[in-house]
């Protein structure tokens, strides 16, 4: 039994929150028992700034993209089963067959996530990156546009079903991954200069999909000032 590691910050985040319950559902047993082994699952977790101290590390679909690698990465403590995509594999000098897919796609294996026929799906749903929430007001923008706002801080089990029932999802990365797995059309968007295209490309290249994001204007003056300041 192993301890599943994910970023559990002050604000909930859809992609990170999937780790909380998805692995035990897919694997059929709990990973939430700390025996000194840490599993790096969904997310950009192969990072010196994130990885906790452990006796052993198992990489199960995680990716790179933020920080330097852990100091002992690749040593005897590390077992790499799979990574998010070909860019992570190339960066880590791994064989191409280690580049599988982002683990969020595994929601497709759950019986309650069987794709719905188009006749049973309705409306457009929008999910911003959770870091866009404090300075933005995307819920109000969605209300004005007649679009369903998906709060990335809501428990992921709830949001997943709302994605499943949408006709189109406009979203940050993990909502798009889930939408793709559930056969719901999706459009990638950029809301901030901090948007990480490496992560998007890592995933889309694992499926031979194009990545053509749409950049949206800020939803508030505060968000506009924030985005401007991040460019310098």
Where do the protein language model's features map onto the residues?
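Active-site anion-handling motifs in enzyme catalytic cores
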Residues: 1-232
């Amino acid at each position: 039994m192993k301890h599943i590691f994910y970023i559990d910050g002050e604000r909930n985040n859809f992609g990170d929150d999937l780790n909380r319950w998805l692995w035990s559902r897919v694997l059929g047993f709990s990973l939430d028992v700390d025996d000194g082994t840490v599993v790096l699952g969904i997310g950009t977790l192969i990072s010196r700034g994130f990885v906790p101290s452990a006796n052993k590390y198992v990489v199960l679909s995680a990716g790179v993209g933020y920080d330097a690698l852990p100091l002992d990465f690749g040593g005897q403590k590390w077992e790499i089963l799979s990574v998010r995509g070909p860019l992570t594999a190339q960066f880590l000098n791994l064989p191409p067959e280690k580049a599988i897919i982002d683990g969020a796609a595994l929601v497709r294996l759950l019986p309650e996530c069987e794709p719905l026929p188009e006749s049973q799906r309705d409306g457009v749903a929008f999910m911003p990156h959770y870091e866009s929430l404090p300075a933005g007001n995307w819920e109000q923008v969605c209300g004005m546009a007649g679009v369903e706002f998906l709060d990335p801080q809501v428990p992921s089990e709830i949001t997943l079903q709302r994605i499943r029932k949408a006709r189109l999802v406009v979203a940050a990365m993990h909502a798009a991954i889930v939408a793709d797995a559930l056969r719901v059309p999706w459009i990638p968007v950029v809301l901030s200069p901090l948007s990480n295209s490496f992560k998007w490309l890592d995933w889309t290249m694992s499926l031979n999909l194009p990545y053509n994001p749409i950049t949206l204007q800020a939803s508030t003056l505060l968000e506009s000032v924030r985005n401007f300041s991040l460019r310098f």
